Regions:
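Active-site anion-handling motifs in enzyme catalytic cores
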Residues: 7, 11-14, 18-21, 30, ...
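Short, charge-enriched, intrinsically disordered boundary segments that mark the beginning
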Residues: 1-6
Length: 441
């Protein structure tokens, strides 16, 4: 398979198919834009941003990217019209977005895409694990010639694969990034690697993942679950398990082929990756009055939480541990996190949503997750970042998690310092975006 085909296959595996248009449609849209440019020059309409985001719904973190960026646009660019071009907003996500952002137009067909290409002034690629919608950014650039930017991505050479991307595929991505008005990377190693690979966009800097700004809530669902399981506000911690590679092949609707190499790596590390979490749970229960909620960030983690954590705990500890058996959406999850004393585990975006609200959160990571976890160092939380492949880091996990329960006030203060730093960076990025938007005439 050609290197570019390999890269595109990986993108499609992650994001799925999105609304697209034919070459004839592109030609028609380009012609319409040319004809409408004269009228645009004399108009006084709102400027229009096309947000390319919403990659998948099997992970509440991937859901959170979009409402986070939409909230920033709502706050800092209230006079700008926003259209969302999603890959997947099923499983109730569309309803969440429409209820929270009723003024945002959601693109659902190739005709909508063609209209957006014609009528929008700026394309903003949302946060993600890489330049997920690279082909759509290329389409925008080639068919419209209008400006675009990238908001909070990781840049790596593997896209969550066990093998590196071909140099040709990386070069193609760099070419797209170089055409952007700005590229914001969500972790500093991504910025450094992009520069090393030849990326030289006019503005390149760190910016927090869009999910930090998410404000979705579902208080009724969260309160009902917590009441049912006697979990009282600020008297419990959340814990999230995770395989090194998400086993998408276990989710029927994804129809992802079994990946033997990824599964082998998962099974090789799964015990070592969860033993520190188990011990932390034991110490929390036996040394403090707090309980622990085992909860998921994606649809593969409920079973993992039971088999690797709950079922292997001593009976006296199990009595104060609640296992959530079903998946949830971002609003209910975030409402739950807001009522907790903090969160720890092997995931990234639930901690992001916590820190975005000033809730303490500890991140355990490994190389297979790319460099995204290093954002914790970028925002001043290096003491809450642990590399599971470094024995010295592993030794510090349990005592550090325990401090969330023994010194909740100190932990909250630390989280809020990081939150304020993130918010300042968000303001800077929105000012940059505002400065790059074309005048509306």
């Amino acid at each position: 398979m050609h290197p570019e085909q390999i890269a595109m296959q990986r993108i499609q595996e992650f994001a799925g198919e999105s609304p697209s248009i034919s070459r004839r449609g592109l030609f028609g849209a380009g012609l319409a834009m040319a004809l409408s440019s004269l009228a645009f020059a004399n108009s006084d309409r709102k400027r229009r941003i096309l947000l390319r985001s919403s990659w998948q719904t099997v992970n509440i973190g991937d859901i959170a990217h979009t409402p986070g960026v939409l909230r920033l646009l709502e706050k800092y660019l209230p006079d700008v019209e926003v259209r969302l071009w999603p890959s997947n907003i099923g499983n109730g996500v569309e309803q969440l977005l429409r209820e929270r952002f009723p003024s945002v137009t959601i693109i659902k067909s190739s005709r909508d895409v063609a209209s957006a290409l014609e009528e929008c002034d700026f394309l903003l690629h949302g946060s993600g694990p890489f330049l997920v919608a690279q082909t759509d950014v290329e389409r925008w650039a080639k068919s419209t010639g209008k400006p675009y930017g990238v908001y909070g991505i990781t840049f790596s050479d593997n896209h969550y694969s066990t093998k590196p991307l071909p140099p040709e595929a990386i070069a193609r991505t760099v070419e797209v990034l170089n055409g952007a008005k700005f590229v914001f990377f969500r972790d500093s190693p991504s910025l450094a690697l992009a520069k090393e690979k030849g990326c030289h966009a006019p503005i390149m800097q760190f910016a927090p993942d869009g999910a930090f700004a998410t404000d979705l809530t579902d208080d009724p669902r969260a309160d009902a679950f917590l009441a049912k399981h006697d979990l009282r506000a600020k008297q419990f911690l959340c814990c999230i398990p995770r395989y090194r590679y998400t086993p998408y092949w276990t989710i029927p609707e994804r129809k992802t082929p079994f990946d033997a190499s990824k599964n082998e790596i998962n099974q090789q590390h799964v015990e070592a990756d969860h033993a520190p979490l188990r011990q932390a749970i034991i110490e929390i229960v036996r040394q403090t009055e707090m309980k622990v909620l085992l909860c998921p960030e994606d649809q593969t983690q409920m079973a993992l939480g039971k088999s690797l954590l709950l079922d292997r705990l001593p009976q006296d500890v199990q009595a104060k541990v609640v296992w959530r058996p079903d998946y949830w959406l971002t609003g209910e999850a975030r409402s739950t996190y807001l009522r907790s004393a903090g969160l720890f585990g092997n995931e990234m975006h639930s901690p992001i949503m916590c820190i975005g609200a000033g809730i303490p959160a500890i991140v355990c990571r490994w190389q297979e997750q790319t460099s995204k976890g290093m954002m914790w160092k970028d925002i001043g939380l290096e003491d809450w970042l642990f590399d599971m492949d470094e024995p010295r880091d592993v030794e510090r996990i349990v005592p550090t998690v325990l401090t969330l329960a023994t010194d909740p006030q100190g932990a909250a203060e630390k989280a809020n310092v990081a939150r304020k730093f993130v918010e300042k960076q968000q303001e800077v990025t929105m000012k940059i975006l505002a400065g790059e938007l074309p005048d509306s005439g």
